């Protein structure tokens, strides 16, 4: 049962303790933690080692791997960055602060995935969300490139905006 932003993001992002390339080809680990957009694996490992504070262990497949607690630590930092970027956004902060807790999680999920500056470009959708016109906002969000690129995830998030419930997160 999803009851927190962490649960929601873990559902959408998954949690992989082994370094991998995301859909954009970027080195990622943990709960959707972007290590770098640099395509050089050795550079990604160096960055990751700086983030976790020690040499990365290699698993049996000789791939860099972190512990569950390191994944948790990276996630907490990423979550703080996402929430702080919402709070520091002139476009998003007022909208976010006037949402119920489930819809706050939905907006934070979008920011976690795309960044506050990209979410701020959803002008029509954000206006409809601000006006609490949930059905219209859902239609607008469904017509986005975001929905085309990650339809399963975006449809779950859109459902939260539309219904105010977490029923799509089972």
Curated annotation (Swiss-Prot):
Belongs to the glycosyl hydrolase 24 family. GO terms for biological process: cell wall macromolecule catabolic process; defense response to bacterium; killing of cells of another organism; peptidoglycan catabolic process. Signal peptide: none annotated. GO terms for molecular function: lysozyme activity. Keywords: Antimicrobial, Bacteriolytic enzyme, Glycosidase, Hydrolase. SUPFAM superfamilies: Lysozyme-like. It catalyses: Hydrolysis of (1->4)-beta-linkages between N-acetylmuramic acid and N-acetyl-D-glucosamine residues in a peptidoglycan and between N-acetyl-D-glucosamine residues in chitodextrins. The keyword Transmembrane helix does not apply. Its EC number is 3.2.1.17. The keyword rRNA processing does not apply. InterPro entries: Glyco_hydro_24, Lysozyme-like_dom_sf, Lysozyme_dom_sf, Phage_lysozyme-like, T4-type_lysozyme. This is Probable T4-type lysozyme 2. It comes from Dictyostelium discoideum (Social amoeba). It comes from the Eukaryota. It is an enzyme of class 3 (hydrolase). The active site is at 13 (proton donor), 22 (nucleophile).
